[in-house]
Amino acid sequence: MNQRRIARCLSFAVALSLNSFAVADTLPLTAVDLDKIHQDWGKPGVDKSVDGKPISIGGHAFEHGVGTHAASVLWLDLGGTAEHFTANVGVDDDVKGEPKAAKTKVEFSIVCDDNKTLFKSGPMKVGDAAKPVDIDLHGVHKLVMIVDSVGGSIDYRHADWAEGSFTYSGSKPVAIDAPGETAEVLTPPAPATPRINGTSLYGVRPTHPVLFTIAATGDRPMTFAADNVPDGVTLDPKTGQLTGAIAKPGEYVVKLHATNSLGTADRELKIEVGDRIDLTPQMGWNSWNCFAQAVSDEKVRAAADAMVSSGLINHGWTYVNMDDCWEIPSNRPAEQRRAPDGHILTNKKFPDMKALTDYIHSKGMRAGLYSSPGPSTCGGYTASYEFEEADAKQYADWGFDYLKYDWCSYGEVANQIKKGPNPPSALEILQHPYSVMGDALKHQNRDILYSFCQYGMGNVWEWGDKIGGNSWRSTGDINDSWGSMAGIGFSQNGHEKYAGPGHWNDPDMLVVGKVGWGPSLHPTHLTPNEQYTHISLWCLLDSPLLIGCDMTQMDPFTLGLLTNDEVLAVNQDPLGKQAARVTKNDDGTEVWAKDMSDGSKAVGLFNRGEMPAKVTIKWSDLGVTGAQHVRDLWRQKDVTSDSDSFTTEVGRHGAFLVKVSK
């Protein structure tokens, strides 16, 4: 009996010993479902870079791994049975020699469960040696592998997880979708009583046409009145449109009234007649992000109609802008592109430009169009090179109020200038074409808002105002991805000192609603949280707000994003003080704040991380003391705060926008 018991004990001990020395299973990263990777460009490469080339980092080749493109993210369910993850990370050598790649940096990070950071590479650029990853995963259930862009160009961010491998005992690591979100409309319905919205500051040059529509919500019918209207201007009591011209420079304070059966709303409008226009950032629509080359007179008119029928006009949205592709293709014979007197001709999709602007103006809005300083536009259509005066006159004669001027083919002209004798400086070459068109626009008896589109070259924010720009693109083109939108928006810190009434940094158009850059549209790829971040951040940045979606297909969520008057008031505040970053934390949270004309602070609490996180703003960081009143601007309700700070939980890629005041 004792021998049998001893044998059983020995067998158990041997089994226990063998189990303790069992080798964990191994799973290469390439074996998980890589379709779950969300990345800004291309598809993940299996044992290849995102460009399909053998993986190489810092001159060292790797046989296996995953090639991706920042920004990218992969969620995994480890089930608590994983033990280790190892890899080598870095920027792939396949972007060597690309000028934009030289300025691009990426950062790899791995977080788990309660937003705990397990690995962070720090910024890496092409040519850097691969950095090893070796992390303990015992007890970890959810793992997120992230590659972020760190400044520089948004292109050529080829990032590799080389030789990535998990060890585990139990269930295999499984790639999963990122957590879903509900598209919750936070904006309360506008009250039935009258409320005047939009800008309270309007700039116009002496003797130039005035067109200002009182933006007001509330039940219709509604009538409008105004006190102290300047000589030369009249108000239509039915439409609320102020039109005419003011001869004498100066500042005029007009008292506006909007009345319906439930009451009257009053508000002051300051009209400044002088050299400055665009005294608060422009708000409107642009055709490119939804229609691109498919734009037409019919679609522009439909956008104007939708601006009215949706009620956006009642919240201060003003401009209806057609982008590229209204002209004749630049490869056509000269006589087909321009009339004998030099004025530019339109293609058959735009039969009558004057009739189109008249239509837009009749609805109380302003009209915009597009050109380039080079021989052809980005889309390959006729542009303004050597016809700047003729084109500016034509735009004014047609009745346009806005010009987007896109660098495009001028790069070819610039290269020829550089090769000539005694070439100007690089900065002078960048400035020259914008100065030429700026002078031409000033010669017109009409205010035409001048929007530079040259992607931030030469630090345009430092000189754009000096040569007549009302706004200037500060980065490359945006697209409807988190990496693009967040990479552009959160890179604006430091530019705030160059912005103000009449001259604004422009981080590009809004990518909410249905977009697509052509006839085939899709709902934005931004999640609901990301869209709230997008609008909140652009308003804090005093960015021009140009809707890029098909206005005829707006859903309630998109409409809610674009009609919150307390949020839009941050953007349209007459002080014109762009927000700056106040704090930036290792967990991906940031706080941005801007001064408001009433002495308050507009504050954005952002979470760029992959998991919910608490975000705090201290009154000391805002330069204020004592108890503060805090208002949630999206929900339009007051919230409680501590005596010296405010803290809230912000979801993945989300935002919480507040106003802090005494």
Regions inferred by a protein language model and the residue ranges of each:
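Carbohydrate-binding surface patches
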Residues: Y532, W538-L541, L546-G548, K584-V624
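Glycan-recognition surfaces
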Residues: A390, K442-D550, N571
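Gly-Asp-aromatic-enriched flexible segments
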Residues: A24-T187
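Aromatic-lined carbohydrate-binding/catalytic grooves of carbohydrate-active enzymes
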Residues: N289, A303, M307-N422
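Solvent-exposed, low-complexity, repeat-rich "mucin-like" stalks and linkers
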Residues: P194-D219
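C-terminal beta-strand-rich structural cap/linker in extracellular carbohydrate-active enzymes
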Residues: S641-K662
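Strand-loop-strand motifs at the edges of beta-sheets in extracellular beta-sandwich domains
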Residues: G232-K248
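A short beta-strand micro-motif common to beta-rich folds, especially ectodomain repeats
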Residues: I214, G250-L262
